[in-house]
C-alpha cells in the first residue's frame, strides 16, 4: 500500500453535483454583476480560471516556475505602460505562490528537500546575508532605498535558486524551458523590429523624451532599440545569452526541424543584440562560446571554435570591412578604446573611485546611479551614472561586496563546468 496519496488520482463526482455547482456558479456570477458592478463580476469570473491554475500547478510545480519565468520576462514592459502598479509586489507574490505550491505538495507526497542543499544555495544565502546587513551601512541614508533594491539584487537570486532546484527536477523540464525561452526571444526581437521599422509607441516615446531615456538611447551612432526590456543594455545582454544558448543547443538536437528552429532563434537573437547597440553585450557570445569550446574536450571543435573567435575578433578590431553598415560600425566600437561613449564611462568611473575611496561597504543598496536620486537627491553618487551592473554593485556594496559578488560568480562558473565535464553522462544535456 502506498504511504502517500496523489493529487492526480481521478475522482468520481456525480453529474448531479457537478450540475448543481455550475448552476450555483452562474447564479453567483450574475448576482455579482447585477448587485455589485463590473469589477466585482470580473473578480468572480476569474475564480474558475484561478482554481484551474491552482490545480494544474499543484499537479506539476514546474509549470508554476515556467509561469514565473514568463511573467518576469514581460514585467519590465508593463512598468512602461502602468507606472503606478506595484510590479515588484507581483513578482514577490508569484515567488510566494511557488513556495506555497511546494508546501502543499509536501503534505501529500515526499519532497526531496535535499536537492536545495547545494553549494549554489549556500553562496546565494551568503550574498543575501551580506545584502541584508547593508541595512546598517552607515553610508546609507534611506531604508526605503535599501528595501527597493534588496529584493532584486539578493532575495530573488536566493529564492529562484531554491525553487529551481526543487521544481525543475527532470530533463524534460529543461526542454520545456528552452521551448518557452525561444518563443519569448522571438517575441522580444519582433518587438525590437517593430521599434526599428515602424517607430516607437506613445508609452515608449514618453519614456524616451519625457523620462530621459533619449540621452542614452538616441545617440550620435544611432538609435539603440530596447524591445520591451527596461533598457537597451538589458535587451542586448539577454539576446547575447539567448544567441549562445540556442546556437549550442541546436548542435545536439537530433530532430532536424528542431535544429533549424533553434538556429533561426539564435540568428534572431544575434540580430536583436546588434540593434540594441549595447557594446558590452558582445562580451556574452565571446565568453560563452569560449567556455563551451574549452569544456568540449573535442580537438576539432576546439580548433574550429578558436579559429572563428579569433577571426571575429580580428574582423571587428583590426579591419574596416562593412564600416558603412551602422550595425557593424556600432559593434566595432566595442573594441575601440577611443570611442567617445567609452571615454565617458571611464571618466564616470574615475569620479566614482574618488567618492568610493572611503566606502569599503559601499553607499548602501539603492544609493547608486540615477535611481538613487529618489532617496538621496543631493548625494554626489546620485549624480553619476553607474553604466553597468558591476559598477552598480560596486557603488552600492563597496569593494567588499563586488569582490564577494565576483567570487560567487566564479564559483558558480567553476562548479558548473566541473559538473558538466566530469559528472554528466547524457551527451545531449552535457552539450558535447
Task: Give the residues covered by each predicted segment.
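Transmembrane signal-anchor hairpin modules in multi-pass inner-membrane enzymes, especially those
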Residues: 1-133, 172-175, 179, 254-260, ...
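A membrane-periplasm/extracellular boundary helix in multi-pass inner-membrane enzymes
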Residues: 35, 190, 195-200, 270-271, ...
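A conserved mid-to-late transmembrane alpha helix and its immediate loop/hinge
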Residues: 227, 231-233, 270, 360, ...
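Hydrophobic transmembrane alpha-helices and their immediate junctions
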Residues: 256-259, 290-293, 397-432
